[in-house]
Amino acid sequence: MMPLALSAQHTFSIVAIDSITGEIGSAGATCGDSIIWPGTPGAILISDVIPGIGAIHTQSYYTENNQLNAHNRMLAGDSPEEIINWLVANDVSSNPSIRQYGIIDFNNGSPRSAGFTGENCFDYKNHVLGLNYAIQGNILLGQQIIDSMESGFNNTSGCLSDKLMGAMQGANVVGADTRCMSEGTSSLSAFLRVAKPGDDPNAIFIDLNIAGTPQGIEPLDELLIKYNNWKNNNNYDCSTQGIIESLDESETILIYPNPAGNIIYIQRNGIPLSKIEISDLTGKTILNQNISEPKTTLEIEVGHLKNGEYFITSFAQGSLVSNNKFTISSNN
C-alpha cells in the first residue's frame, strides 16, 4: 500500500495539555470531509495523540510518513521543538515550506509547545503558542480566527475537553476556512479528542469525530451536540474543574512591570513562592530557579533576555500555582 498523501490543506486546529491531570487533547476542523477525500475519516486524519506523552498535528499537504516520523521522534524523547526541527530537515518530499505543525508534550507536568508554519502554506496562515497549547491554521479568513480560538480556550472554564470545545467554537464562523464560504459553514469536518494517562492509544477517553455533514450543516455545531451527548451519556460534568486550580483572591499572582526591562517582580499574597521557571514561546526553559528562602515577592533579573514574549511558571510548596505571560521590550 502506498503511503497516504493529501494535496488538500488542513486548516484550524489545537493541541493542548492539562498539566495537573495529565490529559492530552487534540481538536480541529477543515473544509474537507470523507466525501471529498474518499477512504478518510475527515479532519481527524491529522490528529496523533500519544497518551501520557503528547500530541502532534501535521497539517497542510498532509503526508502520512511525516506524521509517522513525528510520532517516532516523540516516542524517542524529542521535545516539540526538536521534532519540528527534525521534520523540517527531513521532510519526506524535501519541501517543508508547504507544511504546518503544532506539537505539545507533557514533559513530567511542565508542558512544552512548538509550532511551524511554512512560508508556502496558503494564506491566511499562522500559529500561536501558549505554555500548554499550540493553535495553528491556514487558508483562514484572517488572524481573527486564531485569536478567537485562543480566547475561547483561555476563557472557557472547566476541564481540558471543555476548553478545547471553547477553542473550536471560537472558529465557528462562516468561511473560517475560506474554501467553505460558499457552503455557509466554517468547515466540512471536525473532531475533538482527549486521552487520559494510561489510555490505550486506540481507545482514548474522548474520541469524537464529525467526518462530514450535509450541505449547509455546520460541523462545529454537530461536534458540540455530540460532545454534550457524550457528557450526558457518561454523567461527565467537569464545569468546576480547571487546568490550573483557581487561586483565592487573597492569593493573586502579580507580575510587574509588564513589559519589563532588566528586573521583573513576582508577588503572591499567600503561601510564599518556592520556585519559578521562565520559558520562551517554543517551550524552551530559559531560567529554572529554586528559592532557598521562599518569599511572597521575588525580584528576578531578566536583563540578559532578548526582547519578546515569555512564560513564567510559579510554584509554592512544590505545586504549580500560576502560569503567566510577560514581555521584555527594552533590552538590546
Ranges and model annotations:
Residues 1-2, 169, 197, 248, ...:
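Residue-level marker of positions within ordered structural domains that often coincide
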Residues 9-240:
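N-terminal nucleophile
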Residues 1-10, 311, 330-332:
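Bacterial Sec-dependent N-terminal signal peptides
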Residues 246-332:
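C-terminal outer-membrane/trafficking sorting elements
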Residues 2, 16-19, 277, 302:
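N-terminal hydrophobic or amphipathic segments with adjacent small-residue motifs
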